[in-house]
Amino acid sequence: EYALLTGIPAPGFKATKSGETYDIKAYEEFCKAISQQIPNCKYIYIALRNVMSSEHHTFAGVLYSHGTMKYTRVFDIDNVIDCVGVGDAFCGAMLYAQHAYEDEQKRVDFSTADSVLKNTIAGDYNIVKVSEVEGLLAKHESGEVAR
């Protein structure tokens, strides 16, 4: 959506498994350009998805704020049940995290992990608990999702 709003082309996200890296520098430059066009925007969150098949996606998130970039590891979701509502889950978790956590890295980690879990739930509504999101962050350093 940022690319549509600003006319600035977004970098591609091509990670195919957990443990892969993605071009953080390109996303940082993208976010800097957005912040120049929209100077009153304090936080730029971006959810990143690559779809290998209907059941296999990778997912990550970035947050640009006050000239600094925070980013998550790549999550490998090989048991996607329903990807409808994943963006809504990301936004809802972002709003929750903005108020629940001081640390910006924790905010983007939480928002991303919440969205990752939503991929494993049928329907448009995300019904995961905060404890499930925090559990995914604590237990799955590899980025692979098992639910």
Spans of features found by a protein language model:
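A generic structural signal for short hydrophobic patches within well-formed alpha-helices
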Residues: 2-3, 133
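Short glycine-rich, flexible loops that bind phosphorylated cofactors or substrates
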Residues: 3-4, 53
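Phosphate- and divalent-cation-binding pockets in alpha/beta enzyme and binding domains
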Residues: 4-5, 93
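Conserved phosphate-binding/catalytic region of the ribokinase-like
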Residues: 10-147
